């Protein structure tokens, strides 16, 4: 099972992408086998394990899937905010979903998620830009 190493074992941070939009700076950085989507001054939005982009590194993201377990056969899902897309990836990988929609405020986020963070171009996934 992946997991972030202790702080004293972390490798140097490598900046992979940086863009500015109306809301500020968006960065993608890599530390070892992990990539992070950051908003603003190193505000970590998402963490992606490169070996499996559907792996949910943080407890709160795993907890967000609990609602899906209450439904015998979920067919659709709506995400208000895409981020790195690893929660979306996990749902597409592990749930029998036919239609998934993500609404993301910042237009560069989906492109960065696909280019650097392992978000797959899945035909079941529709990404819309807008204020959720």
Give the label of every model feature segment.
Residues 51-132:
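The AdoMet/dcAdoMet-binding core of the Class I SAM-like
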Residues 1-74, 93, 99:
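Rossmann-like AdoMet
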């Amino acid at each position: 099972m992946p997991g972030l190493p202790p702080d004293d074992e972390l490798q140097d941070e490598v900046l992979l992408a940086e863009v500015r939009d109306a809301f500020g700076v968006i960065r993608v950085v890599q530390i070892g086998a992990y990539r992070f989507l950051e908003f603003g001054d190193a505000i970590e939005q998402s963490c992606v394990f490169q070996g499996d982009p559907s792996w949910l590194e943080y407890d709160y993201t795993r907890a967000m899937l609990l609602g899906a377990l209450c439904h015998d056969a979920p067919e659709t899902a709506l995400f208000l905010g895409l981020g790195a897309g690893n929660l979306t990836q996990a749902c597409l990988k592990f749930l029998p979903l036919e239609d998934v929609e993500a609404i993301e405020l910042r237009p560069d986020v989906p492109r960065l998620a696909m280019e650097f963070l392992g978000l797959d171009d899945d035909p079941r996934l529709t990404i819309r830009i807008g204020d959720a």
